[in-house]
Design a protein with these regions (language model features):
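Phosphate/NTP-binding elements of NTP-utilizing enzymes
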Residues: 1-173
Length: 173
């Protein structure tokens, strides 16, 4: 899914909730949920929001273990952590859910491509790209935005539209 929305409309909260739901309720053994961004501080915003949700919920606190490195669901050997393109150890990841934040700031596709490659072993992987329109857009955002716009046009049979049932683009302008 691709979700573009203006600032301060709850992107991080939405992503965090989806990540926690998939961590605990989807039944995926060894689930790896990653909040990713260009830099670690940005990736940690979604993850930290999830940590706050766990701390505020007695039900989640009883099921999950939080550390400085991640949120763990031991019953399913599942993990929710933050990663960034500046991280050196991205190979070997087996993500079930990838929460890609603020793609307007991304310069290249390397991190996203590595996550998508890692998802190939999963039966029902989820990639959620969220972003504001940003200040200086780079290649990744423009490519995703253009493709999403064409898919939306395809759903409503407009000229220039394409049909791709593997993504759900949502653009609020």
């Amino acid at each position: 899914a691709i979700f573009f929305v203006a600032k301060k409309n709850g992107k991080s909260t939405l992503s965090s909730g989806i990540g926690l739901y998939c961590l605990t309720s989807d039944g995926e053994g060894g689930a790896e949920i990653y909040s990713i961004a260009k830099v670690k501080d940005q990736a940690k915003i979604v993850w930290q929001e999830a940590v706050h949700m766990v701390k505020k919920s007695p039900a989640l606190r009883a099921r999950l273990r939080t550390t400085i490195n991640g949120i763990f669901y031991d019953r399913n050997d599942a993990l929710f952590a933050a990663l960034a393109s500046e991280t050196n150890s991205l190979d070997g990841k087996n993500p079930f859910v990838v929460l890609a934040d603020e793609i307007w700031a991304w310069v290249g596709m390397n991190l996203l491509n590595m996550m998508e490659d890692g998802m190939s072993a999963r039966e029902q992987p989820i990639l959620l790209e969220t972003s504001t329109m940003g200040d200086v857009r780079e290649k990744v955002f423009d490519n995703e935005y253009d493709y999403s716009s064409k898919v939306i046009k395809g759903y409503i049979n407009e000229p220039g539209g394409i049909v791709d049932e593997t993504i759900l683009p949502i653009i609020y302008e």
